[in-house]
Amino acid sequence: MFVQLFDIVTLPKPRHPKDWRPAFLAMQLGFLAGAIGLLGRDLLIFLTVDDWAPIIAMELAFGMVIGVGFFLHTVGFASSGVILACVGGIGSATAFIMMIGWSTAFYLWYVNLAVLLLAVPIRNWIKWPIAVSFIGIYSIAHLFLSGSQPVFDIPAITKDVLAISNIIG
């Protein structure tokens, strides 16, 4: 059973686009790394923030959207899965900024996800408008959220660790 599950997650399906197949495992590992990062962020928030429940609930909600993207990618709907996962990541970044405050490290989510979309072999008429909208959302977030007070006050060290993990990850 473990071998079957391993094959399902690591081998591209026949419906997977041929030009995506060489990168299938790398994309799957990227999803896995993101899940590990989410759990690490949630553990840090749980251990250091008194009012942790809403922040973690938001993280898990957008994590589920990204998880559906992972599932779609795994079963062969590569472009739909990647687009959905990127939209979930943008939602997570925006909610993070609103809840714990603006940090220059958090805007990297917008830029990284836009670049990811541009790098994968999705039709240009699909990926370019989405990538540009991600940058537009970032610009709007900067204009309206960079000077706002966070909903939750978190320790500076927690914000710094989250920022550094975002830069590295």
Predicted features and spans:
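Membrane-embedded alpha-helical segments of multi-pass membrane proteins
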Residues: 59-64, 105-113, 164-168
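Hydrophobic transmembrane alpha-helices
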Residues: 38, 83-108, 123-165
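N-terminal juxtamembrane segment and adjoining first transmembrane helix
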Residues: 1-81
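Extracellular-loop-to-transmembrane junctions of the mid-late helices
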Residues: 23-31, 158-169
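Intrinsic-disorder/low-complexity, polar/charged segments
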Residues: 14-17, 51, 123-124, 154-157, ...
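Structural signal for the C-terminal ends of transmembrane alpha-helices
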Residues: 71-73, 119-123
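Hydrophobic, membrane-inserted alpha-helices
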Residues: 37-41, 63-69, 86-94, 110-116
